[in-house]
Amino acid sequence: MPRTPSLSSDGSVARVCRLLPDAETGRVALVDMRAACGFPSPAADYEAEEVTLDQLMVRNPLATILVEAAGDSMVEAGIYEGDLLVVDREVEPRSGSIVLACYDGSFTVKRLRLDPKGRIELHPENPLSGCGVLRPRPGEQFEIEGVVTGLARRF
């Protein structure tokens, strides 16, 4: 995947990866079962089908980018440093969506909220991060680039 650098809000460089719809991808077996994360369930015979991760994670390949998360402002939303965020640029952002936004020349990932007057606010999801609510004002550079629809993480 081609990668282009972009600046995150703290000045560090994050990677942005574009998905290539014609690229060959490896297939992984998707087993037709649910794995208990609490008490184990009895084993059984399960069917498997082959899928690619992009088939599971990407709804609009031509409008989707992957962005590496930097910082800790979204940990209570389950987004951690180094996570690869699936960002769909065609999904309509709504209040409550987690969005990738360009604000004053920096990219940031925050929870989109509307104040009582319908004005946009971008909320962090970690009160300990030191990042406050962002409230774009008229005349400031601001654009929602897309909605975060999923993520991938390595252990």
Regions found by a protein language model. Name each.
Residues 82-83, 97:
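Structural motif
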Residues 75-76, 89:
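Short, conserved secondary-structure segments in the cores of folded domains
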Residues 103, 108-139:
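Aromatic- and Lys/Arg-enriched surface recognition patch
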Residues 95-99, 110:
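Short beta-alpha junctions and helix-cap segments that line functional grooves
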